[in-house]
C-alpha cells in the first residue's frame, strides 16, 4: 500500500489535535537568549502534525561534515556531527503551552530542550517563548501548495528477508509540498552521563567503524516534493 492508497482508504482526523495554525513546516528565523545573544545561522526545521513534532537542527552548510567511511573521520569532525540534532516526540497543547512528551526518538542521548513552549501566531510568523524567559524563537511558516497532512509514527522497520530490525521508532510527516522523516536507532544507546553523552562516546570510538555506525544509525531528513 502506498501513501495515496492510504489517504483514500484510511484518511481520518484524530479527536485531539494542536490548533490548525500550528500545523505545517516552519523554519526558524532566529533565537534570542536572555544573555542578549541571537542566532540566525543555525538551520532549524520544525514539522508539526496533529499530535507529534519532527525537529532537525544543523549548522550552516559550510560547517557540515562531508560523508566518508567511518574510520576516516577525525575527532573534530565527529564532535561536529555529534552536535547535530534530530528528534521526534508526541506533542500536547493545553491552550497556551505546547508540551513535548520526553523525546521519544532523538539523535542526542539527552533532552536539550526541556521547557514547553508558549506559542503565538502572527501571519506566517509563530513566536515561541520559554516559560523561564531563557529564550524566544521566531519561526516562519514555509509557503506550500495545498496538499495532504499526513502524520505516521513508526513502530519499527524490519528487513523482511533477514528479520533484522533496521530502525525502531520515529515518524513521517507530510504537509503539502514538504516531508520530514525520523528513523530511530534499532537499539538503545545507554548514556553514561546526563549531558553531552554522544560527544563523549564518539571521542572514545574514533576509528571504530562498528561503534560509530551504531551511534549514528539515526536519520532525520527534510525534503520538498510531491507524493
Q: Language-model segments: what does each one mean?
A:
Residues 1-86, 97-227:
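Lipid interaction determinants
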Amino acid at each position: 500500500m502506498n501513501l495515496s492508497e492510504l489517504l483514500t482508504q484510511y484518511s481520518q482526523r484524530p479527536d485531539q489535535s494542536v490548533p490548525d495554525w500550528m500545523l505545517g513546516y516552519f523554519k526558524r528565523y532566529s533565537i534570542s537568549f536572555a544573555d542578549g545573544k541571537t542566532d540566525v545561522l543555525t538551520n532549524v526545521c520544525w514539522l508539526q502534525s496533529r499530535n507529534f513534532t519532527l525537529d532537525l537542527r544543523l549548522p550552516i552548510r559550510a560547517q557540515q561534515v562531508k560523508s566518508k567511511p567511518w574510520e576516516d573521520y577525525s575527532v573534530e569532525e565527529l564532535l561536529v556531527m555529534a552536535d547535530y540534532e534530530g528528534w521526534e516526540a508526541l506533542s500536547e497543547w493545553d491552550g497556551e503551552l505546547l508540551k513535548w512528551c520526553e523525546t521519544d526518538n532523538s539523535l542526542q542521548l539527552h533532552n536539550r530542550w526541556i521547557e514547553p513552549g508558549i506559542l503565538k501566531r502572527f501571519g506566517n510568523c509563530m513566536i515561541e517563548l520559554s516559560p523561564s524567559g531563557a529564550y524566544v524563537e521566531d519561526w516562519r511558516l514555509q509557503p506550500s501548495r495545498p496538499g495532504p497532512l499526513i502524520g505516521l509514527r513508526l513502530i519499527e522497520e524490519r528487513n523482511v528477508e533477514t528479520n533484522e530490525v533496521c530502525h525502531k521508532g520515529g515518524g513521517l510527516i507530510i504537509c503539502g509540498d514538504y516531508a520530514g522523516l525520523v528513523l530511530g536507532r534499532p537499539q538503545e544507546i545507554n548514556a553514561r552521563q546526563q549531558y553531552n553523552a554522544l560527544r563523549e562516546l564518539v571521542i572514545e570510538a574514533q576509528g571504530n567503524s562498528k561503534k560509530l555506525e551504531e551511534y549514528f544509525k539515526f536519520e532525520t531528513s527534510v525534503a520538498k516534493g510531491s507524493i
